[in-house]
A protein has these predicted regions:
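Catalytic cores of nucleotide-sugar-dependent glycosyltransferases that transfer UDP/GDP/TDP-activated
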Residues: 1-402
């Protein structure tokens, strides 16, 4: 099959990663290529990816957006580790650098959530749809849309007269973060559906937000308008077809569970277990490997601190802890403590259970670290909710193994 993946991130390109979606897009493309499929991956260029060494402009074409004609450019980019059967593409337009050159996401104020990003990715999606219609990627068999950023392709495919031709191509929609749903009004704002595509005749009941009926929900759009919906595991499918209950630390369908349950009953929702690929099974050399990791971490934290006008307490605590662990390695040979690591956004989805107060009055994370004392260490790399950052900083100040 000839598969076109459409996404906001892709770690196959330097500078195109913020979160886990980039890892999935990077790894799934060569995995499919190994099964004799042709895979093409398309991203916004953010006015920087097209400048990478070896990139070439392949086409320049026009799309209609905000009621006017916009010109976009399509570039091929070799990527960091080119793979046979995988072609990397980026599409460029000044709007894709709305947050600054090379920045993938914008931080909009609370009264206009997703506004800049939604407009940016809507333009990206109409460019992707136009390029696919023009045959710039060859005869496509599958459009693989990643998260809400790519779901406007499904909207155009369903309702826009210029792009209903894409209905002959199968669509798959992958859910990466169900909590971020890309909600924007239908009207009354420059970042609204009918501002992007004036006169678009939409079946509102299939794409409107379940809480705000005057708004488009781009996550729901991808779920309801795609032929197949993919989630990261069979267990996760069982979770997201149930209502969320954040008070108990359970994050299910985030308001979209009725749509997800319907998709499951229709045979459209599938859970495929995410995996991690390792080059080979190597017997770990604990002392030398841990020392090398800690030295690299020490160097990186110092590099971060050098760019700060005022010292961030999280970096100070981390540097002190890393140096303490290095001293302990020097003093004691054969350190057999296990090392736990976590990298991710600090959101309630990931951290809420760790904040829960146990019977002894301590948080779950405090209790875990107490149980690990002398037996294991935890390194957590992440940023996000300031309240969660502060909670983790306070815990780090209490435990020598965090």
């Amino acid at each position: 099959m000839n598969i076109l993946m459409i996404a906001a991130e892709n770690d196959a390109l330097a500078g195109a990663k913020v979160g886990g979606i980039a890892d999935v897009v990077r790894d799934i493309a060569p995995a499919l290529a190994q099964r004799s499929h042709q895979v093409q991956v398309l991203l916004p260029g953010y006015q920087s990816l097209s400048e990478q060494s070896g990139s070439q402009r392949h086409d320049r074409f026009e799309v209609t957006f905000w009621g006017r004609v916009e010109t976009v450019e399509l570039y091929s980019v070799p990527g960091r580790n080119p793979v046979d059967g995988v072609q990397q593409w980026v599409v460029e337009h000044p709007l894709f650098a709305a947050a600054g050159k090379g920045r993938i996401y914008c931080d909009d104020p609370p009264d206009r959530p997703f506004a800049t990003d939604a407009s940016k990715f809507a333009l990206f999606c109409v460019a992707a749809a136009e390029a696919a219609k023009r045959g710039l990627f060859g005869q496509l068999d599958v459009l693989h849309l990643h998260d809400w950023h790519a779901s406007v392709v499904a909207l155009l495919r369903a309702y826009h007269a210029d792009y209903v031709v894409l209905q002959s191509i199968h669509t798959v929609f992958s859910i990466h973060n169900l909590a971020l749903q890309g909600i924007r009004p239908f009207d009354g704002d420059i970042s609204a559906v009918h501002a992007w595509f004036p006169g678009l005749d939409i079946e509102y009941k299939r794409v409107s937000d379940p809480r705000y009926s005057d708004c488009l929900n781009l996550m729901r759009t991808g779920i309801n308008l795609s032929d197949k919906v993919h989630a990261v595991s069979p267990t996760y499918v069982a979770e997201i077809t149930q209502p969320s209950c954040p008070e108990q630390g359970f994050f299910g369908g985030e308001g979209l569970d009725p749509d997800l349950l319907a998709a499951q009953q229709q045979g459209r929702l599938i859970g495929i277990l995410n995996g991690a690929e390792y080059d080979s099974a190597v017997e770990p050399k604990l002392d030398s490997e841990l020392e090398r990791l800690l030295l690299a971490a020490e160097s990186e934290v110092i590099n971060w601190m050098s760019k700060e006008t005022h010292c961030y307490s999280g970096h100070s605590i981390a540097l002190g802890r890393i140096q303490q662990w290095l001293r302990n390695l020097d003093q004691k040979s054969g350190d057999k403590q296990m090392l736990l690591t976590s990298v991710g956004r600090l959101t309630d989805q990931k951290v809420l259970l760790l904040r829960q107060t146990m019977l002894n009055g301590k948080s779950a994370l405090d209790n875990l670290l107490l149980q690990l004392a002398g037996r294991g260490r935890l390194i957590l790399l992440g940023s996000g909710d300031p309240l969660l950052e502060q909670f983790l900083l306070e815990v780090a100040g209490r435990h020598a193994n965090f």
